[in-house]
Every structure is written in C-alpha cells, then in structure tokens.
Amino acid sequence: MSTMIQTLYKPVEPNTFNIAKDIKLLICDVDGVFSDGLIYMGNNGEELKTFHTRDGYGVKSLLNAGIEVAVITGRQSNIVENRMHALGISLVYQGQDDKLQAYQDICDKLKISPKHTGYIGDDLIDWPVMEKVALKVCVADGHPLLVQRANYVTKTLGGHGAVREVCDLILQSRNELEVHQGLSI
C-alpha cells in the first residue's frame, strides 16, 4: 500500500496527487457543485441560488496560475452566467443535456487533452464526462455511484467550498498554493 499524501483537507493517494499536478483545465458542474443544489423559487417565477465566496477565491487562484476553468450545466440561468462572468470564467455551457459534447468542444477550443483535464460533478449526468478526464472529482454529498467511481471525493459539500477544495488540491500539488491568490468575490 502506498503512503498517502496529506493535503489541507484530507490524505490522498499519490497517484491522485500526481494527476492533480498535471491539470491544465478544470471543468465544473453548477447545481450541487458550485451551488448546494437547491433552487429557490419566488411567487413571480424568480429563481435564486447561493454561491460560496470560497469557491470564487479558488477559481480566481487557478486562473491566476494559468489553469483554465470552464462550466457545463444542464440548466439555463442568468444567475449562473452572471456569477461565472464575475469569476472570469468565459467557457460557460448551459442547458447541456449532452455534457460530453460540450466537454469535447471545450477541449478542442483549448487544445487540451483529457489527461490534463479534471471535472467536478455530483450526479449521474456528469459521469460521461468524468470517465473521460484524468481527475474525476465528486462532491461529498454527490450520488453514491459517482462517489464510488471518482478518484477524489471532496471532504466539503457541494455549494459549501467543494470547488475551492479541488482548486487548493491542484495548487498544492504544484507547490503553488500560496503563490497564486485570487480575489474573494
């Protein structure tokens, strides 16, 4: 059995740590990953979601380190567009029933191979992309099948800093955790 590597959040397998070191593109789902998965609906049809500022800080830190960040979500929402724009994420794919096609498009645009990509998901719709990437991440409260199949399961719940945890893992694996700081937003 290999010796685990201690990260800020939990011990990880050396192989997972090495995979994280080679990530050039992190793709995230939104509902259940960036948000807690709850959708608040008002009487007039308005929709509200919450996003954790820690996740924003982590994303900005990755971008400052030259690591691309993209979003693929099954739903369509102006809230998501505005939040991702505020974070500096330009590759935002919404309303995607076929997340694999969106993933291929992102990789083609950026000319990044699957061995340099990671994906954070929480439900079965995310698996087709997750099985293609090197760093397969499921949030702590994700679907049990994804938890079983992921090579990293966050300690943190979706919408409560899970994205930040993965950003920190990637930066720590590169010895750049304290070098690239984002702005909390």
Per-region residue spans from a language model:
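Non-catalytic pre-domain segments flanking phosphatase-related domains
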Residues: 1-28, 176-185
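Short, flexible loop segments at the rims of nucleotide/cofactor-binding pockets, characterized by
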Residues: 3-5, 10, 46-49, 94-95
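Asp-based phosphoryl-transfer active-site loop
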Residues: 22-39, 130, 163
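Short secondary-structure boundary segments
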Residues: 30, 74-75, 96, 140-143
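A positional/architectural concept
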Residues: 34-64
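Mg2+-dependent phosphoryl-transfer enzymes with acidic/Ser/Thr/Gly-rich catalytic loops
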Residues: 48-49, 85-87, 91-92, 100-185
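Substrate-recognition element of Asp-dependent hydrolases with the DxDx(T/V) motif
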Residues: 59-83, 93-94
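Feature captures the catalytic cores and cofactor-binding loops of soluble hydro-lyases/lyases
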Residues: 78, 97-102
